[in-house]
Amino acid sequence: GPGPHIIMDHLMEHSNVDFQWGNHDVVWMGAAAGSPLCILTVLKTTLAYNNVDTLERGYGIPLRCLEHYAEEYYAQSDLTRWMPHADPNATDVRPANLARVARMHKAVTVLMLKLEAEVIARNPDFEMQGRDYLRQIDYDAGTVRCGGKVYPLLDCDFPTVDPTAPERLLPREEDIIARLVRDFKGSEKLQKHVEFLFSQGSVYSCVNGNLLYHGAVPMDEDGQFTACLLYTSPSPRDYAAS
């Protein structure tokens, strides 16, 4: 939603605050730490909801280089499916501004898919090969394979994607990502907010015999917990309620 930086300012004034991190919290922490893929994920969500002010004014993160890049490659694109979910009470819902945001939204999504392809290829144990969408596309037929089925693409305009190596970044794209990493890591206010979020939060906590968590716990069809591969060892507090 709009103004998360304002909410964080208010929360930091309280003496007793704790968080159970959700997926968006973790992505923002990753972005502040300089993860390119987390940064692009944050940007995609921000642009999809026309919440650019949070980045540009709230955290002082300029998007000019991204805007120029999107204008160059997607100025003639059909942006119908990339238009942001505009709040009618937002400060700028002019068609020209919405088109600007839509171009950046598409540009960021393609960049994000390129980086996702690299991560999936480097980590076969994630078993996410089916989510490597750029490699699931038949660029000649204009279709994509998803969940074992083939669907027609609603947008086939990929001027920056090489079908033979879809994850490959253009030199300009590498430069844009490097600038975004620098600006996210260099935002003093963002770093302050994320440090507070990190120091006062956890993925879950056990309080009075209750497990507090955000999101969902994996279960099977019979309502039993499913086994999960963890990339860290359990801590003593995992057994606090047992």
Segments predicted by a language model, with ranges:
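Feature recognizes metal-dependent phosphohydrolase scaffolds
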Residues: 1-238, 242
